[in-house]
From Swiss-Prot:
Compositional bias of kind Basic and acidic residues: 68-90, 110-125, 157-167, 262-295, 337-346
Localisation: Cytoplasm
Domain of life: Bacteria
Protein name: Translation initiation factor IF-2
Region (G5): 577-579
Function: One of the essential components for the initiation of protein synthesis. Protects formylmethionyl-tRNA from spontaneous hydrolysis and promotes its binding to the 30S ribosomal subunits. Also involved in the hydrolysis of GTP during the formation of the 70S ribosomal complex.
Compositional bias segments (type: Low complexity): 50-67, 129-141, 309-318
Amino acid sequence: MSKKRLYEIAKELGKESKEVVARAKELGLDVKSHSSSVEEAVAAKIAASFKPAAAPKVEAKPAAPKVSAEKKAEKSEPAKPAVAKEEAKPAEPVAPKTEKVAAKPQSRNFKAEREARAKEQAERRKQNKGNNRDQQQNGNRQKNDGRNGGKQGQSNRDNRRFNDQAKKQQGQQKRRNERRQQEDKRSNQVAPRIDFKARAAALKAEQNAEYARSSEERFKQYQAAKEALAQANKRKEPEEIFEEAAKLAEQAQQVQAVVEVVPEKKEPAVDTRRKKQARPDKNRDDYDHEEDGPRKQQKNRSSQNQVRNQKNSNWNNNKKNKKGNNKNNRNQTPKPVTERKFHELPTEFEYTDGMTVAEIAKRIKREPAEIVKKLFMMGVMATQNQSLDGETIELLMVDYGIEAKQKVEVDNADIERFFVEDGYLNEDELVERPPVVTIMGHVDHGKTTLLDTLRNSRVATGEAGGITQHIGAYQIVENGKKITFLDTPGHAAFTSMRARGASVTDITILVVAADDGVMPQTIEAINHSKAANVPIIVAINKIDKPGANPERVIGELAEHGVMSTAWGGDSEFVEISAKFNQNIEELLETVLLVAEIQELKADPTVRAIGTVIEARLDKGKGAVATLLVQQGTLNVQDPIVVGNTFGRVRAMTNDLGRRVKVAGPSTPVSITGLNEAPMAGDHFAVYEDEKSARAAGEERAKRALMKQRQATQRVSLENLFDTLKAGELKSVNVIIKADVQGSVEALSASLQKIDVEGVKVTIVHSAVGAINESDVTLAEASNAFIVGFNVRPTPQARQQAEADDVEIRLHSIIYKVIEEMEEAMKGMLDPEFEEKVIGEAVIRETFKVSKVGTIGGFMVINGKVARDSKVRVIRDGVVIYDGELASLKHYKDDVKEVTNGREGGLMIDCYNDIKMDDVIEAYVMEEIKR
């Protein structure tokens, strides 16, 4: 079976598609829109549901539009009403049905409308007597023009255009005539003209009458009061008369005030302006007529974008409502002027250094100009964007009568505050922690051997030159209690490392060799421990040697303030032999005893804080830092700020190289995850989140850079001479690369302390890690050489150094680096020469030779006169000339020298004024060794 769509059914029924869709849904059909299709049986069912309008389907379609079209013809052709009526007669039988259809514009019969328009055009052509041509004729004419072409076609087109314009003008004139006829018919409906003078006179008379009615009561009251006063005056004395008159006058004023306050009821004012008559029957095409007469014809009437009804257009409405149109704005009330609100001054003002004038004005709700004026009166020239110091802000607030308080801001980037804040640790959560013990002493007194014995390992045998290069942190267990040991180098170059070890330690073990006694680094270690207020345990080592004398060591230490408990002091002394493991247990028990006396406590519940023991740059791991946790607990993935760098703890390893996830107080660990290698001795702190840690780290790095820039020495009158002198010095540029940060610091400090007159050391760059290509490039650019300490260059860096002729010096012992640097610095100095007199001679005779000069015959009286020596001419004890010899002869032979007691002849270069008895002094310049 075939199907039908709903809009087809609606077209057949003369209904709207949405009505058919709604009726189908009421019948229970599953349809979605007018495009849905149904079976023919279902379509018949839907059609049957529209019983009132279903019978005359086919006949109603042409009839309805004919009526509507011919009605339009009646409107457009008012001059021919008879023709329209005659054409409408055949549609009379179906008139009731077509009215229903005509009410639905969606079902218009376009064919009938086209026929009606064609008839209308035919009628117009008859009336114009052949001046207008139909569309078909115009089309034929265009075809003929196309065939003819040339000038004839152009002239035909011009004629056609002229005819079209004439036809258009005739049509417009016809419509204007028709509208004028309609205006004449409606002329009897125009309102009569208003006499404005009569209207104004009537309005004025009405106002005068109203005023008379309102003032009548006041006049009666005043007259009654006047009569009463006259009667009273007949019976009263003059004084009483004046008093009564005053009272009555007062009452009259009060009455008049009441009358003036009571508003008078006025009739609404009559609008006397001429009103425009309503024109409901006026067509939209009446553009060339208004009530006041004809107006200019609009141009470009055929444009679709032009607003045809200018009277109702938005553009004209906006133009009439503009601000400059006095006609529409005469009755508008002016906008009220906003008054500035008065704000009271605050009682307190919390400020920070560096606040600007604009910020202060906003806080106290005053204008910046007012504050600038007050500052000017105080003698301070400022603008609204200028920062003020705290003292100026306080004086300004005193002038306003406001109490000024400086705001205490918490610096998020300040790590040191965690170490000094009282409220950071929870007193209820404090537990006992392991002691941190630092082993200190002179070079080769057995510090690393002792630590090796404690750890039962042989790390000490691998140390180059018998000295420890960097701090090692280890933990051991004694009697169930942990002890953390720090090993510090004893060489003089590592002073900063020993001071750093003393600052983080709880107990110092001072190792002194029984055969050597007290040495310079021993005294330095004592001073560091006393400065840090750390108790000292003296371990007298090497008691197994034949020349050991512990008593001498005790006496020497007593001279430096370290007294034994046996001598009435507070330092414990233990005689040990680290090599043969003698009295090691006694030493550990002494350490635990001193730690118990100190009552060392820590809070493991807070975020971890501590100190960097060492830092290095690993090729595979990146920046590696050895940390000593002093308070709190350090966990993996904690956001951390270390010195001027930051990061997240990626991995942690203990002193045995095993990975751990948690590190408690007094625990040394190595961590990775920092973006840069920190400096040894820097503090670290764990933050709440990575965002705050990053902000703190970046802020600390920025401050460090600013501090470094501010430390640059500026030239002044005081240091001008030193600056000029320093410019004459020669410089040795050095790039230092080491395995750990402590060695880098020690090398830098030691090289800068080398004192060679005329030469200074400039550290171009120093870092931890292997020597790479960028180091070689920097050395070539800065004319420097590279010192590698316990590191090696990469193969690429070695090849580049050979190609660029960059010198790389590799060392593992620090004092060898210092000696080599001194020799290099001395070799850079300009040689110094010393004058040495080698002989004297006396002129016996002079000979003048033309074209040669003056030859002086001489006799050597002391030493010798050499050909390559310099000479001075001395006459009467005064040096006349100082120069070189041009020639030296013995008789006629050229000789290299003339010895004592012999005679010869000489010529002096560029000097001929030689006279008899002149003394010739010969001398040479010899280089002085430094």
